[in-house]
Amino acid sequence: MKQIIFFAIILFFVSCKKNHTDTPYGLATYKDLNFTNYFKRTTGWVAGDGGFSVALNNGNSLWLWGDSHIGFYDPTTKSVPCLFQVRNAGLLMGINNPQNQTTLTGTSNPASYFYFGTNTNYWFWPGAGYQNGDTAYVFLSRLKANGGGTFGFTEVDSNYVAKIKIPEMSIVGYSILPPKNGIVFNNAVVKNGVYNYIYGIKSNGFGNDLFVARFPIANLYAAWEYYGTAGWSTNLSSLQKIHSEFTSSFNVCKIKNKYILITTEFSVACDQGKNIYSYTSDEPYGPFVNKKTVWTLDDQFQGHYPFFYLANAHPEYDNGNNELLITYCINEYGSCVNTCIEGRKDPNFYRPKAIRVPYKLIDTSL
């Protein structure tokens, strides 16, 4: 889903090299089973992909999902219908107590949280966001159906922003930003000083280029500044890529004095990429260096690995052990294993997984 699926057809026939870095002695990433279990819900939001989180100032974090299963969980078979019910959803989750959760959907049919208009051939997939004052802003991509199957859609535009009233969590409006030369700016938003730094990607034919822009935290609609070889400029044409990689999963966060870039190995089907990588930089615009393989998937089923994507960092969920929470999405096992049996499936094949990565595994200075 999100950009990983949108660019998947372009990337499908291309191969890439793995780049492994030795793990510092005594440091290891582990599957956070407790946090993974928070997503094993049986009512409301039950399963989905996406997994961007927006830390709010009321002790909660807004989790944002794409195609999602809402209800219809059978406790006897522990299964859900094979087809999801909504195109997007929200989940309000406590930061200190993640078991406190509230599903957020809308009143349309289907009851997606974000919707605009009545034509169900169009829908939103949410990306990153942030809060300012009593409003959360979420960056959205708008899609249109153009056929059946996993990739039966096309992106219409990526410049929509939803405004959400806090603490009511009601959507109070949508706006559309000026075009950004085909760059999808919704991979990450990082606050630093008076600015929000926003990251976006654009296909280069063999992967994606990563870009960064910034705008005042207090005013999303002020003139954006774009980073290029000459520094920051309000001229969009001055924008230059800050990183390139054979993937569509990019996420950035800040830990202490380092900017952390999280990417994934290329995967659009079963038994493809299995690795999650980290890079570090002293500046929001890179260069991102010090590549580490911080996790290799362990989600095998009948000897096969799933289609996986969207490794996102959630620094607000600090466990006090200098470990970064990262979630990643899996989307069943494709042609390798038939997981839809008599119209139902195990929701765990479409639920996010959580890992904890030691800061010093990412960078020994952290």
Predicted region positions:
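Positively charged n-region of N-terminal signal peptides that target proteins for export
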Residues: 1-4
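Extended, non-transmembrane interaction/recognition domains
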Residues: 181-188, 195-198
